[in-house]
Amino acid sequence: MTNLLSGRISLATAGLLMMLSGLVSAQVLNESDLLLQPTDLLNTSTQGAGNGAYIQQLGNENELQLFQQQEGLEGNLARVLQSGQWNIAIITQTDQGNKLALIQKGSNNYYELTGTGAENELVNIQNGSDNRIVQQFLNSSQISSELVQVGNSNEIVQILENIQGQNFTVRQIGDGMKVIIKQTGQ
């Protein structure tokens, strides 16, 4: 009887672990997520969950630096996939309801985020090689940003300082394009 009981507990524990691993793997970005609308990448809620980070680097020599700090009741979320090689992502998110979903599928792509402030939601997709995105949100609030680059050698620089309630969507499809967005509020 003892063996049967311990066998049942082991099966129940194994089932629970499989269920939990399924939940975590559903959070990780995959290359097939490139087919989704960019805002669909943020549908994972952070309600009551605090910080979260789901990272998948499939290629060689990809680098990720991620810092998230939670100071409120709900948290930051980051979902990162770097599929090619030699991609670099440097992500800093601080308090409140920040989210980020980043896909860099090609090679030699660079992404950097310095974020502070309130209700930030970001989606960044770089599908190509030698692309660069730099975002700085200084003392900002309620920012929703979607930046998509499909092609090679493209660059987006977005600097927002003391901005209240912004919503950006920039899509570059092609090669060798550059956009600089700099806004300063009071």
Regions found by a protein language model. Name each.
Residues 1, 25:
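A short glycine/proline-enriched turn/edge-strand or helix-cap micro-motif
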Residues 2-12:
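Bacterial N-terminal signal peptides that target proteins for export
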Residues 13-18:
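Hydrophobic helical h-region of N-terminal Sec-dependent signal peptides
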Residues 19-23:
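N-terminal signal peptide c-region/cleavage motif recognized by signal peptidases
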Residues 27-186:
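Low-complexity repeat regions of mature extracellularly deployed or surface/particle-associated proteins
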